[in-house]
A protein has these predicted regions:
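N-terminal extracellular/periplasmic Venus flytrap/periplasmic-binding protein-like
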Residues: 1-10, 21, 141-179
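Conserved catalytic cysteine-centered active-site region
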Residues: 2, 6, 34-87, 119-126
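Short, well-ordered amphipathic alpha-helical segments that serve as non-catalytic structural scaffolds
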Residues: 5-20, 45-49, 73, 124-131, ...
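Structural signature of cysteine-dependent C-C bond-forming condensing enzymes
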Residues: 11-28, 48-62, 76-89, 155-165
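Fold-independent oxyanion-binding glycine-rich loops
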Residues: 34-35, 53, 92-94, 100, ...
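Glycine-rich nucleotide phosphate-binding loop and flanking beta-alpha elements
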Residues: 38, 96-98, 153
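Active-site-proximal alpha-helical scaffold in enzymes
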Residues: 65-94, 132-162
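Flexible glycine-/small-residue-enriched beta->alpha junction loops
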Residues: 82-135
């Protein structure tokens, strides 16, 4: 498997390498969002990514807002730049859903919340079902939205709209045969 910190570092190296006259020391901070910060994607993954992709002089941090973690990292970076506390921040998210089990390695639910609001601990699939009921979204509506989204993405890729944003990453493949 490719570790999420290695994956993010490869993307960041490509990003900064594609900017003319850019030096890593120009980066004031690295902010990485991650939904399940455990094991290979836990600890201080933001710092590790900075060490792998930028330099020891660039700090790095990890934030968590579950599925919105990467977007929140970008919001935080924009707010800091807008406030004048930074000029250049690399921000985004990284995750490896195959490296960490759902709910993490040790689920530690809050007893009071689990008794008073058990729905707070619904997984994303069940949350989607609840939201579909609440907002009257049918399966057909959801499928149509998904199809349209994929068609737009394919069209944009074919037209080259994301040629500078999509980075090819070569990974080592591992096959396990249980014969």
């Amino acid at each position: 498997f490719t570790r999420p910190d290695d994956l993010a570092a490869k993307v960041i190296k490509h990003l900064v390498g594609s900017i003319k006259n850019f030096e890593n020391k120009m980066v004031d901070d690295l902010i990485v969002g991650n939904a399940v910060p455990e094991a290979e994607q836990g600890m201080q993954m933001g710092r590790y990514i900075s060490l792998l992709a930028l330099s020891k002089e660039v700090p790095g941090m990890i934030i968590n807002r579950y599925c919105g973690s990467g977007l929140e990292a970008i919001h935080l970076a924009c707010a800091r730049i807008h406030a004048g506390t930074a000029n250049c921040i690399v921000a985004g998210g990284t995750e490896s859903m195959s490296m960490v089990p759902m709910m993490g390695y040790k689920s530690a639910l809050n007893y009071t919340i689990s008794k008073e609001h058990p729905d707070y601990y619904l997984n994303m699939g069940l949350t989607a079902e609840e939201l579909a009921k609440e907002y009257s979204i049918t399966r057909e509506m959801s499928d149509e939205f998904s199809l349209n989204s994929h068609q737009k993405a394919i069209h944009a890729i074919k037209k080259g709209f994301f040629k500078d944003e999509i980075v090819s990453i070569e990974v080592e493949e591992t096959y396990i045969n249980k014969e």
